[in-house]
Regions:
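Membrane-interfacial helix-loop segments of redox and metal-homeostasis proteins
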Residues: 1-146
Length: 146
């Protein structure tokens, strides 16, 4: 897959992630019950002690993470690509931790949260693939491939 296609995939994933995290952030601040689907217990997850980190909703952290990744996709510098990969891998690790908490501490699953974890995992893979394939010149810049 070309870098251009990988970038397009990353943009789509980041936009979907923004939608999911945005919805969960909205649900948090409005205090409404989320549409959870069959077999899920979003309310239990979203009101658990792991729904906030130092008073900040984890959904808002996800929203910031997806927005950061999306923004970096339009910057033509190696540092932006490295930053996007780093944010995606931190998001992956944090999502894995939260999924563990869902399964073994909260004893409930939030399909929206799992969807976000899957999206962040895919973004980590796509961004790492782009980074590993990226040609660099002596100035550290990566040629922008549309």
């Amino acid at each position: 897959m070309s870098d251009r296609r990988l970038r397009q995939v990353a943009v789509v994933l980041a936009l979907i992630g923004l939608g999911v995290a945005g919805y969960l952030t909205y649900v948090h601040y409005e205090g409404i019950e989320s549409v959870c689907g069959l077999g899920g217990d979003c309310e239990k997850v979203q009101t658990s002690e792991w729904a906030d980190l130092a008073g900040v909703p984890v959904a808002l952290l996800g929203l910031i993470g997806y927005a950061t990744i999306l923004t970096t996709l339009f910057v033509e510098r190696e540092e932006a690509l490295i930053a996007a990969a780093l944010v995606a891998w931190v998001g992956f690790g944090f999502s894995a931790y939260l999924t563990y908490r869902e399964l073994f501490s909260i004893d409930a699953i939030c399909p929206w949260c799992v969807a976000s974890a899957v999206i962040m995992t895919l973004l980590a893979i796509v961004m790492t693939t782009r980074l590993l394939r990226a040609p660099t010149d002596h100035r550290g810049a990566i040629p922008y491939i549309g």
